[in-house]
């Protein structure tokens, strides 16, 4: 198994640098037939989604579709596929950022009763408590 860094995954997905994209494809080619041979860890997923949204201006629906494609590709493995899949489902059905969905899902999986936040979109997620600051 090998791990992909964010910039390698971005090159693979966007092909905005043909030489780098080709280099990534060449490195991954021997692993195409090997199930779960390329790790996409949670940090890489979050950084990738942030970059695609902010820098490349991907729409939310395109990001959701991309996450679903990554999950269905047999070559890729994840820190916890079930947690990532649940986070993708939350992302698809809410206004929260993927990172917030992943935080909430992972915290619940790790036994947290709830996750507290000041983020309104995240606060609407299951097992998330929206805090309100009281004025002095």
Language-model features, listed with the residues they occupy:
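Active-site-proximal, substrate-binding regions of enzyme catalytic domains
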Residues: 53-56, 60-71
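Short, well-structured N-terminal submotif of metal-dependent ribonuclease cores
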Residues: 1-40, 55-61, 132-136
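Short, conserved alpha-helical segments within structured domains
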Residues: 41-44, 83
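Acidic active-site catalytic centers that drive phospho-/nucleotidyl reactions
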Residues: 5, 47, 100, 119
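Acidic, PIN/NYN-like endoribonuclease modules and their adjacent C-terminal/linker elements
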Residues: 104-136
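A generic structural signal for short hydrophobic patches within well-formed alpha-helices
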Residues: 9, 45, 122-123
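Amphipathic alpha-helical segments within well-ordered protein domains
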Residues: 10, 49-53, 88
């Amino acid at each position: 198994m090998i791990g992909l860094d964010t910039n390698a995954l971005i090159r693979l997905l966007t092909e905005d640098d043909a030489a780098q994209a080709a280099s990534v494809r060449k490195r991954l080619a021997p692993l195409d037939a090997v199930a779960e041979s390329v790790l996409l860890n949670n940090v890489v997923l979050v950084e990738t989604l942030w970059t695609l949204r902010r820098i490349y201006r991907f729409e939310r629906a395109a990001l959701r579709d991309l996450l679903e494609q990554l999950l269905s590709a047999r070559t890729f493995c994840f820190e916890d596929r079930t947690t990532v899949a649940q986070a993708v489902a939350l992302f698809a059905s809410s206004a929260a950022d993927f990172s917030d969905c992943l935080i909430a899902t992972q915290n619940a999986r790790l036994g947290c009763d709830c996750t507290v936040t000041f983020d309104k979109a995240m606060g609407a997620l299951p097992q998330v408590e929206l805090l309100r600051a009281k004025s002095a």
